Amino acid sequence: MTSDIAMQLIAILEKTVSPDKNELLSAKNFLEQAAASNLPEFLKALSEILVNTANSAVARMAAGLQLKNHLTSKDEKVSQQYQDRWHQFPSEIRELIKNNILAALGTENTRPSCAAQCVAYVAVIELPINRWPMLIQTLVNKVVSEGSSEMHRESALEAIGYICQDIRFGVMENQSNDVLTAIIHGMRKVEPSNHVRLAATTALHNSLEFTKSNFEKDMERNFIMEVVCEATQCQDSQICVAALQCLVKIMTLYYQYMEPYMAQALFPITLAAMKSDNDAVALQGIEFWSNVCDEEIDLAIESQEATDQGRAPQRVSKHYARGALQFLTPVLVEKLTKQDECDDEDTWSPAKAASVCLMVLATCCEDEIVPHVLPFIKENIESPNWRFRDAAVMTFGSVLNGLETNTLKPLVEQAMPTLIRLMYDSSVIVRDTIAWTFGRICDIIPEAAINETYLQTLLECFVKSLKSEPRVAANVCWAFIGLSDAAWEAAVTNDGETPETYALSPYFEYIITQLLETTDRSDGAQANLRCAAYQALMDMIKNSPLDCYLVVQRTTLVILERLNQVMQMETQINNHSDRHQFNDLQSLLCATLQSVLRKVHEQDAPQISDAIMTALLTMFNSSAGKSGVVQEEAFLAVSTLVELLGAQFAKYMPAFKDFLVMGLKNFQEYQVCCAAVGLTGDIFRALKDLMVPYSNEIMTVLINNLTEPTIHRTVKPQVLSAFGDIALSIGNHFLPYLSMVLDMLRVASNLQTDANNFDMNEYINELRESILEAYTGIIQGLKGVDQTAHTDVMHMEPHLMHIISFIKRIAQEGDVSDSMLASAAGFIGDLCTSFGPRLYPLLDDAIITQFLAEGKRSKAQRTKMLCTWAVKEIKKINTQVITQ
């Protein structure tokens, strides 16, 4: 790079912090053009500016930032593209950039180090493929060498921290000891620089997943714990907080090793942190004990599972939370009294953290928590100080989830009159907390909420509170959801039929009217009130008994009228905020429409279906219909209507088909695409061969979706399931697509699970279940409904060996879900009825026999039934083989 070009680039970089918008835009455009014209040379030039200490701090920082932004992205796909691009650079340019950014470490006078970030992001690309082998040792040397400057130690530790944060697990395994040596060296209390200690402590936090082998060795673990505990006592609050964060993470990762340190170090350190007036310190102290509780809740579940299976648990709880309970609860309830009147709902505070900690403590310690919190609640629930009233109510609401019903019910019933009275408290914060507590009561101990002694009084205060401040009204809406669920559960019988009446029937119409009014409040956007009110409305409708049906019908018409009114408002939208609210409202109305339609009686559906489809088609046709959220909810509303109308939906297909295809093609918004695919299956099942005229276009789009490389993987299982629905519905009309679909199913069925990739395994299992559903639909569709299988099913015979091998592979890999087992068993039964004795040699296999035997022992009724049926069908064809 010539000096003139370098000077020009430096000048441009310095303009990236200019207050002048024109200069900023000009600089942005120049840098984008430079990157587009020759990216390797551009990044090399940036690295040369970064390494040159004669350049201004602004230019160097901007160069580092530009360099970093061309190496990584928050979007995983883009980040992968950047990594692939880096590998294609000429090796001499890659090496020069690496040398420059490494040489720049410790030479900056700004924090954090841009060079450290650049080094880390190149390392994340290169270390997994064994390039830049000396990097880690070089960074370690910069930290531990006696002559190393403060800036060198700090920036090297920052680089190590960034690498540990982003590198793929396992890559650093052979160098974890060296990394840990450097980190612990930088954390020691003899280190004179707090900047270095902070960078080291942050790096430790990022590297803890890699230190498993070190924590397994007593001496190494003792040394690590000593250094971390020392760091928690540092006068620099940032170091103290970072060290506490390490303890929080250590407790989660290495719980089983913590017993030697708990009484003497961890307990006193974290209790003192909880009591701190520094919010950041207090939050970490509280977080530590929340994590302890989470861990011990999981261990209790594991222990119960082990007992049920007649084996010893792999890990056991040390019951630290129970042991600390009497010391923790006074600190936590005291933190609850420190809430700020102007607290932003999104700001995490010690008071909010204390509430969460009390919840998990109650879950962990159950009834043992009661004597430690009840005196505080009784003493303060009617305190003249609103903070103490609120803390008492918050404590009460927070511990409900862990208590046994026998303990909980009398406590709640005794508290009900006071709680109802507090719904009219002068403090909005107290009323908000009370409304939240009632929501929890309705959810956790519903029988207390619908107790006729208090029900009418409770409903009166709920309805009045719907007119309160948005935050209070929103919590009341969530309480209505719990109340609605409680009333329904109390009334519904074992057969699952809709009950004739329930506890809320006398008040139902009034509640619905008030909720509809709440959805229309001008301040409905605050505290998510409008959404909460519509959710409550949907839940009330969903859980309505037969004697409330007239109100449901009227509500359907109200929602339909609102949908039409809202669409007429579209011309009045002036800005992005209005558009966002408009789309949200349409999506809520579509969701509510689904809820009311599910309760509409089948014979009443044709009377309203024209009006509903007209409204939905108008919406699809409007610009709002292009919004992903609106499209998704609208497709789900159509799906509910299809379920109601059955084959009568056919008259809407000519007008609706193009919008359905538009949704199927919208794979960029995968939720919309999934909703459209699900709806496609629903329509085919309802209309059967009436869908044949549309099959070609729809199948073409679905097949294209499966071959589209950028489509979100969530869509693929849905498409495969849809193939099954389509094949089942149109029978031999599916034959033109059979070969291509079977090829796709074969490719999908060959995907292998990976023991180290939980997410991928979850996806593969979902895919496999969809494959089984597709095969089942195809077999049933081609077989026909007659007792004797139609000859069309013989098109599947060449594929039977692969299909049975696929089922055997599922069986051999183990850990099969009940739903997968049921799908496989049902499919095996269908194969038997379709192919008879000729199938027996493929099914006469110990793997299949064992697989179905396991299913017969399942606790899930459907799985048990289908596996039993499949075994009978196999025996039947075996008998036929013997008698032939």
UniProtKB/Swiss-Prot annotation:
The Importin N-terminal domain, residue ranges: 27-107
Organism, as annotated: Drosophila melanogaster
IAB: annotated span: 335-348
Gene name for this UniProt entry: Fs(2)Ket
GO cellular component: cytoplasm; nuclear envelope; nucleoplasm; nucleus; P granule
Protein name: Importin subunit beta
InterPro entries tied to this protein: ARM-like, ARM-type_fold, HEAT_type_2, Importin-beta_N, Importin_beta
Region described as Ran-GTP binding: spans on this chain: 340-425
Major localization listed first in the record, in broad terms: cytoplasm
Superkingdom of the source species: Eukaryota
Function as written in the Swiss-Prot or TrEMBL entry: Required for nuclear protein import and mediates docking of import substrate to distinct nucleoporins. In Drosophila, may not function as a snRNP import receptor as it does not interact with components of the snRNP complex such as snRNP U1, U2, U4/U6 and Snup.
Gene Ontology biological-process annotations: chorion-containing eggshell formation; mitotic cell cycle; NLS-bearing protein import into nucleus; protein import into nucleus; regulation of nucleocytoplasmic transport
Tissues of expression: Ubiquitously expressed in embryos.
Record note on quaternary structure: Forms a complex with an importin alpha subunit. Interacts with the sesquiterpenoid juvenile hormone receptor Met.
Pfam family, one: IBN_N
PANTHER family: IMPORTIN BETA
